[in-house]
């Protein structure tokens, strides 16, 4: 049933995408802000309480509701799974930026590509070169695919019903939202890091399996630890190695030059690597679905045989 829910959610999202989910984002932002105001006393334990209040109720409610629906009808439980996955999972949550940048690069409109990248990453006021625009766009796409697709899938499969998908997306949101708040945000960051530990490694392994395996594993093992955020570094290093492209490297930001180590091996980022990125992400997703479908078939055959 999990495989069917994933397939249905992805198909519906491709047919009728929810885009950036602005209404959902606005509701989450208001909720996170109100919790911060209510609980933030400047200590780590206050952040822990706020995180538990924010995350546990929806996760528990989702698990209980799924259990109740399963007791009534498998179809209702499946529909609930699909509905939640539709809100939490999918390429179309971020791919419009990447696709528009891809089209702008192909059309030779570097100014539009720069503008789109600024909207995606946040304004920096820096005039970037064509190679920088392509390189940073690929980095954003790899991380976004992990956060919006593969990480969600893993935790959906681990916990009952759609509760894992809700847990992962809420944890990711709160970690980013409360990051600037000092010690109050420490627990959210730590909790998300724990959820990311298996997720980033499975995403990296997926990239390796559908790309250049040896390069991906080499870059993962030797380069990921040099990145400022080791979780993100694993995804970027494995993705860059799998595609044979050079990512990372220092970039100019509003507050000065940001030192970043080189990730990947091979060629400088150029237009064709945008297509390569899309192909690798889709192959990785197909791999996940194929493995899940195969496991479901084997399980069904085993039950019939016994």
Predicted regions and their residues:
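Hydrophobic N-terminal alpha-helices or hydrophobic patches in metabolic proteins across all domains
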Residues: 1-306
């Amino acid at each position: 049933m999990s495989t069917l829910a994933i397939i249905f959610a992805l198909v519906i999202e491709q047919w009728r995408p929810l885009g950036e989910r602005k209404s959902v984002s606005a509701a989450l932002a208001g909720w996170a802000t109100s919790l911060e105001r209510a609980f933030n006393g400047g200590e780590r334990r206050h952040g822990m309480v706020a995180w538990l209040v924010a995350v546990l109720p929806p996760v528990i409610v989702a698990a209980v509701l799924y259990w109740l629906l399963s007791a009534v009808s498998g179809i209702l439980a499946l529909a609930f799974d699909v509905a939640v996955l539709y809100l939490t999972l999918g390429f179309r949550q971020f791919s419009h930026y990447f696709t528009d940048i891809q089209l702008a690069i192909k059309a030779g409109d570097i100014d539009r590509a720069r503008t789109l990248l600024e909207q995606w990453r946040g304004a920096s006021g820096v005039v970037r070169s064509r190679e920088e625009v392509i390189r940073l766009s690929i980095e954003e796409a790899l991380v976004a695919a992990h956060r919006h697709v593969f990480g969600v899938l893993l935790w959906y499969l681990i916990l009952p019903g759609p509760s894992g998908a809700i847990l992962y997306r809420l944890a990711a949101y709160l970690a980013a939202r409360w990051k600037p708040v000092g010690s109050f945000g420490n627990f959210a960051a730590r909790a998300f890091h724990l959820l990311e530990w298996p997720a980033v490694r499975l995403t990296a392994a997926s990239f390796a399996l559908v790309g250049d395996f040896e390069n991906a594993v080499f870059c993962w093992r030797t380069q990921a630890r040099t990145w400022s955020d080791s979780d993100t570094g694993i995804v970027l290093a494995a993705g860059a190695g799998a595609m044979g492209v050079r990512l990372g490297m220092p970039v100019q930001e509003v507050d000065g030059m940001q030192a970043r180590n080189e990730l990947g091996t091979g060629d400088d980022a150029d237009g064709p690597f945008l297509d390569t990125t899309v192909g690798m992400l889709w192959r990785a997703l197909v791999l996940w679905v194929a493995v899940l479908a195969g496991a479901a078939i084997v399980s069904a055959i085993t039950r019939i045989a016994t």
